[in-house]
């Protein structure tokens, strides 16, 4: 193998690039070494029995189309693998029944299968020409080398994608309350920063509703933690259904939830209070017990984001909630054995 090819391969591998970018460079070099008109990479779906041409280089009159799919069972590549014949300069005579080869005018064909490091079959790396070309050991070596490099790169990209997906899942998990599926405290505070910035830009005020579920500890103590968890889950589901554009709804932790809304001409504290209470108040089915819940303690404040930051607004809503809890008439929940069990 010439020093020029080795140098170009080394340069290509040293760059951070996509699979497509790498393959296109290798196809160009493969064309130089094999003296073929077309070089191309295919991916094979063995279950569907289809071969897909992913990337192709065509420098002369022969044209191998990209994004072209053929039957795997009737392809040149499968014939080459089945017969262990990876080079032929007599394709019309040897594989004259191959319609694709006949339509493309292929006379000389060189290919090698690509197996990923885990042993799975990926596809083929090929070179073809409408004219007779001689086989060379150098061309065979380069073809095998490039097939191995592509296999390694495909495996690397797959691993990187798995890492990306795992990282995205971890990020999503870190921003989600595991019990209710609502945004958690971390997500709430980050969304608040964005919401306050938006409100300043729109010259809107912000309403913050701090929600404390009265008698939640009593529900837990009397009916067990499973019933308590079901209660929290159902409260979260109900709050989620009232979400409107420009609102942040989440669980701060324990029995505390938060609703933050961009104020507009059609909204006020009393209407937001009623929306929330209507959602929370009502029947809950908690496994072996049905429970009528009269409502939560709400602390709702309206703030100007130009003069009040998110932390101060939350603190004010928290104080307002405790003031309501302190002065509200105690209305116990009513529970009875579940009729649906």
Swiss-Prot record:
Cofactor: Mg(2+)
Catalyzed chemical reaction(s): 2 GTP = 3',3'-c-di-GMP + 2 diphosphate
Taxonomy, superkingdom: Bacteria
Signal peptide location: none
Alphabetical keyword list: GTP-binding, Magnesium, Metal-binding, Nucleotide-binding, Transferase
Annotated cofactor note: Binds 1 Mg(2+) ion per monomer.
SUPFAM superfamilies in alphabetical order: GAF domain-like (SSF55781), Nucleotide cyclase (SSF55073)
EC top class named in words: transferase
Disruption phenotype: Decreased expression of CsgB, decreased curli expression at 28 degrees Celsius.
Pathway membership, UniProt: Purine metabolism; 3',5'-cyclic di-GMP biosynthesis
Enzyme Commission (EC) number: 2.7.7.65
Entry keyword Disulfide bond: no
Gene Ontology cellular component annotations, sorted alphabetically: plasma membrane
Keyword Nuclease listed: no
One GO BP: negative regulation of bacterial-type flagellum-dependent cell motility
Residues that coordinate or bind substrate: 220, 225, 229
Quaternary assembly: Homodimer.
UniProt name for this protein: Diguanylate cyclase DgcP
Organism listed in the record: Escherichia coli (strain K12)
